């Protein structure tokens, strides 16, 4: 597709976690075209950033990846299964999905919230959690750096702590794919940096895990992010390795204003306008 950055490692026969071919989505009520001609492949161990202005189609695209909706045209394969030819309930159980809008009972402890990831429920199903499952929930809290929150009510945890608890919850099913929908939303600087570090360590410890992170801010990308896809008005503007995609010209086109990008020690930043 014109405007896309080719990935030299792409091979149609490679193993894929996600494979989208000529995907389009129209809004049923208005026939508005939301996504158009999306081609995209994500492989094990790749960590993608999904960026675009408000209304570019990021939320709709993430819903497709999470098997929460079907495309109007084209094909979507998630974890080797084509949407429309698979029981999406079983498929969703193999996908980790984290969003700040998740419904979580505020009085549950952090450990109980993580346990609900095993049963895929909002409320705990205590009889289904044996000692091994409970121990795994503790291990995931430790892996995300929040083991001290195990007995703390979720409702009194900070925004950054909640984000890490929800990621631990998503990992209970040992997914091959982790979708993160603006996980840094409303976090202060220390909480953002704690989550960036936690995600970087998570990626290092799980070499086969693939992630897709929706964000508006390059500063939120953890160093292990290897690829990026830019959406503009429902179409892919560019995709591929971060070095070739997160550039001044492409981000300027993506967001419609002059943007300057910098990278230091594996971390990205961007600003718009003149330096003062």
State what each model feature region is.
Residues 174:
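Conserved catalytic motifs of ABC-family nucleotide-binding domains
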Residues 178-182:
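Catalytic Walker B motif of ABC-type/P-loop ATPase nucleotide-binding domains
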Residues 66:
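Helix-to-loop junction immediately C-terminal to a conserved catalytic motif
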